[in-house]
Amino acid sequence: MTNIRKTHPLMKIINNSFIDLPTPSNISAWWNFGSLLGICLILQILTGLFLAMHYTSDTTTAFSSVTHICRDVNYGWIIRYLHANGASMFFICLYMHVGRGLYYGSYTFTETWNIGIILLFTVMATAFMGYVLPWGQMSFWGATVITNLLSAIPYIGADLVEWIWGGFSVDKATLTRFFAFHFILPFVVSALATVHLLFLHETGSNNPSGITSDSDKIPFHPYYTIKDILGALLLILVLTLLVLFSPDLLGDPDNYTPANPLSTPPHIKPEWYFLFAYAILRSIPNKLGGVLALVLSILILAIMPLLHTSKQRGMMFRPISQCLFWLLVADLLTLTWIGGQPVEHPYITIGQLASILYFMILLVLMPIASIIENNILKW
């Protein structure tokens, strides 16, 4: 009798994706982040669902409903902080996952890579709208500043902003629609993630060497299920430590003040995971230029396959490219730091230099380094 796991239409899909999937035998811990992102997404949907049961998307009651969740709902505080810090863990895993893709040349799977970029944009949009929901000072002013960026679009900008706001300022209509979108988008993300996996399984996984691994594959279960469980336990450990010991470490104190349109906070800034893009936005004195740089800072990932000039796929055997990659990581950390600083003398210049370096590394230095490495191999 044939195993039901291999014959049943539903079980067959699960089997071919997570059990009998042929996987390269040499993939490192950097390949754990896909499953960790799946865990983060499930956690966010579940905690978000329970929060939505008690949250009210009305400007007069939104802030107090979040307070009510933390004070009066059974274990509401832990659900709220798991959701808030779960988002931070989500982005840590996302950036590591994208970094892995850049380092090991996974962008040569163009369909998988492009859907990954769409996923990144969707998750960023979801997180931004979620940050608006508690209706604190930073929620309100963050929403005002970021949505206002669309007014830089020529001709239709101003109308577009008012259309998104549902009025002449960020108000009740804005909060209600942001809640609706914040609720539905994670399910869109789930669907996109499924398509992302579908395309990945068409080609099979990449591996650290960048060489085809068809001759040396092992079943996903038990080898990588065990490996993924270890990664998941470490993720849960870090998240639990964060939630139970310093839940507000990554948040902004201004968000514990109810939204007040008449009082602007001294420093308007988004959550830490958007600070690098915010720093790039601020480094350009022109509004439209800043918005374009902001979008391109993420969209630049889409042209990575075109900028790949190396004869090797990954950076495992390419020391010059490795140095540039880690310079890029340091540059992004610098931009993240700058994004959280006030707009004054040393920070403005550092931000502008870091922004130029970011685009220089990706567009100019890495392709040149790859060509140099190709020539070194001939000697």
Swiss-Prot record:
GO terms for cellular component: mitochondrial inner membrane; respiratory chain complex III. Keywords: Electron transport, Heme, Iron, Membrane, Metal-binding, Mitochondrion, Mitochondrion inner membrane, Respiratory chain, Transmembrane, Transmembrane helix, Transport, Ubiquinone. It is a multi-pass membrane protein. PANTHER family: CYTOCHROME B (PTHR19271:SF16). CDD domains: cytochrome_b_C, Cytochrome_b_N. This is Cytochrome b. Belongs to the cytochrome b family. It comes from Cystophora cristata. GO terms for molecular function: metal ion binding; ubiquinol-cytochrome-c reductase activity. Heme b b562 binds at residues 83, 182.
